[in-house]
Swiss-Prot record:
This protein's name: Putrescine aminotransferase
E.C. designation(s): 2.6.1.82, 2.6.1.29
Keyword Magnesium attached: no
Coiled coil: none
Chain positions found as N6-(pyridoxal phosphate)lysine: 300
Top-level lineage group: Bacteria
Provenance organism: Escherichia coli O7:K1 (strain IAI39 / ExPEC)
PROSITE patterns noted in UniProt: AA_TRANSFER_CLASS_3
InterPro entries with a match to the protein in the record: Aminotrans_3, Aminotrans_3_PPA_site, Class-III_PLP-dep_AT, Putrescine_aminotransferase, PyrdxlP-dep_Trfase, PyrdxlP-dep_Trfase_major, PyrdxlP-dep_Trfase_small
Recorded family membership: Belongs to the class-III pyridoxal-phosphate-dependent aminotransferase family. Putrescine aminotransferase subfamily.
Pathway connected to this protein: Amine and polyamine degradation; putrescine degradation; 4-aminobutanal from putrescine (transaminase route): step 1/1
Catalytic activity reported: an alkane-alpha,omega-diamine + 2-oxoglutarate = an omega-aminoaldehyde + L-glutamate; putrescine + 2-oxoglutarate = 1-pyrroline + L-glutamate + H2O; cadaverine + 2-oxoglutarate = 5-aminopentanal + L-glutamate
Swiss-Prot/TrEMBL keywords: Aminotransferase, Pyridoxal phosphate, Transferase
Length: 459
């Protein structure tokens, strides 16, 4: 028998949640009750699969620690009052830290004025953010489309490329093996993991994948497409593959791809959703090779870990296909005043505190420590790699990676794997992580590996 809707039940549940939001602290019994509720509601109303996914942070059979609040810029606190150094960074959203006061203040001040735009009148912050990004991004990137997430920014990039290249008879897209560009239908067509793709086949036609970092494979694909009349509209890739396992291409790869795009008349789309906003030691990872894309995708850290926002920035030549009809691609909430306030404040913090340079310095320190551990534990660790504050430790098998995440959780350091490479644990902390916290992370990793070796020897 179908369950009947209950206004009384919905009202009670929402009132209970609002009461929790208003409380600054919870006592021990309230914390325990909240844990039970959250686990039950995830199981019954969100997705029980998420509980199994969080098995590396299982505590006392509770499936996962329940997050309660930020502890400081670089830590978070669970409902048990335990504080964790954040080396996951919400998959790359906390570049300026948790609840950065500059970002929070900007959003609060805008909230006091007007949280969402009317849609009909011109909204000032969208204009100011677009101008700021035009100044900040490399090359001739000039016009911005704002949305709510990384996958939406990729969708916009693909549609822009299609609209620009269709009159030229170019319809094919080339992406790379191991790529992750999102899970909406268009972005998923560029993503390269079968687990995510197969349930939704057939995906959009016209997408080909070549090995990442192999410039000859890219040239061959462009040549073959030209020979068969399947001319390439755009090449889409990440400067560093994040979900693929933090895979760095050979030096000069992006430069060579840019030259091939120019040679074959293809647009270059760079997905910097994870590598952008200072993460790799430059504001944008493409700046390490002074490469200028035709379209740039941003999201994650753009909202300062406070608001969700994505952006697709393109050259005037490409973006002009939307000039005659700006309603060809729009979104209700994209570029709203609250998200734009957060993004403007985030950029201000990144620049004023020179966080990209800090990411390079502290990233080198962390990576040196992880590489030393790889030399000390070759039976467990295959490799440590990365750039700036985007790093990965790859283990010899999947289970060891899971065990490492669990041991780090016991050491009160939060890490997690990557979506496309189960052997790899990602290290992606806030760029505001202190030197002392960097040292604590390395120390925790050493303790975790030592405990794992003992477990292996005793097995």
């Amino acid at each position: 028998m179908n369950r009947l809707p209950s206004s009384a039940s919905a009202l009670a549940c929402s009132a209970h949640a609002l009461n929790l939001i208003e409380k600054r602290t919870l006592d021990h019994e309230e914390m325990k009750a909240l844990n039970r509720e959250v686990i039950e509601y995830f199981k019954e109303h969100v997705n029980p699969g998420f509980l199994e996914y969080r098995k590396s942070v299982t505590a006392g059979g509770d499936y996962g620690a329940v997050e309660w609040q930020a502890g400081s810029l670089n830590t978070l606190v669970d409902t048990q009052g335990q504080e964790f150094i954040d080396c996951l960074g919400g998959f790359g959203i906390f570049n300026v830290g948790h609840r950065n006061p500059v970002v929070v203040s900007a959003v609060q001040n805008q909230l006091a004025k007007q949280p969402l735009h009317s849609q009909e009148l011109l909204d000032p912050l969208r204009a100011m953010l677009a101008k700021t990004l035009a100044a900040l991004t490399p090359g001739k990137l000039k016009y911005s489309f704002f949305c709510n997430s990384g996958t939406e920014s990729v969708e916009a990039a693909l549609k822009l490329a299609k609209a620009y290249q269709s009159p030229r008879g170019k319809f094919t897209f080339i992406a790379t093996s191991g790529a992750f560009h999102g899970k909406s239908l268009g972005a998923l067509s560029a993503t390269a993991k079968s687990t995510f793709r197969k349930p939704f086949m057939p995906l959009l036609p016209g997408f080909r994948h070549v090995p990442f970092g192999n410039i000859e494979a890219m040239r061959t694909a462009l040549n073959e497409c030209k020979k068969t009349g399947d001319d390439v509209a755009a090449v889409i890739l990440e400067p560093i593959q994040g979900e693929g396992g933090v895979i760095l291409p050979p030096p000069g790869y992006l430069t060579a791809v840019r030259k091939l795009c120019d040679e074959f008349g293809a647009l270059m789309i760079l997905d910097e959703v994870q590598t952008g906003m200072g993460r790799t030691g430059k504001m944008f990872a493409c700046e390490h090779e002074n490469v200028q894309p035709d379209i740039l995708c941003l999201a994650k850290a753009l909202g300062g870990g406070v608001m969700p926002i994505g952006a697709t920035i393109a050259t005037e030549e490409v973006f002009s296909v939307l000039f005659d009809n700006p309603f060809l691609h729009t979104t209700t909430f994209g570029g709203n005043p609250l998200t734009c306030a957060a993004a403007l404040a985030t950029i201000n913090v990144l620049l004023e505190q020179n966080l990209p340079a800090q990411a390079e310095q502290k990233g080198d320190m962390l990576l040196d420590g992880f590489r030393q551990l790889a030399r000390e534990y070759p039976d467990l660790v295959q490799e440590a790699r990365g750039k700036g504050m985007l790093m990965a430790i790859e283990f010899v098998d999947n289970e060891i990676g899971y065990n490492f995440a669990s041991e780090m959780f016991r050491q009160r350091v939060l890490v997690a794997g990557t979506l496309n490479n189960a052997k790899t644990i990602r290290i992606e902390p806030p760029l505001t992580l202190t030197i002392e916290q960097c040292e604590l992370v390395i120390k925790a990793a050493r303790k975790a590996l030592a405990a794992m070796r003992v477990s292996v020897e005793e097995a």
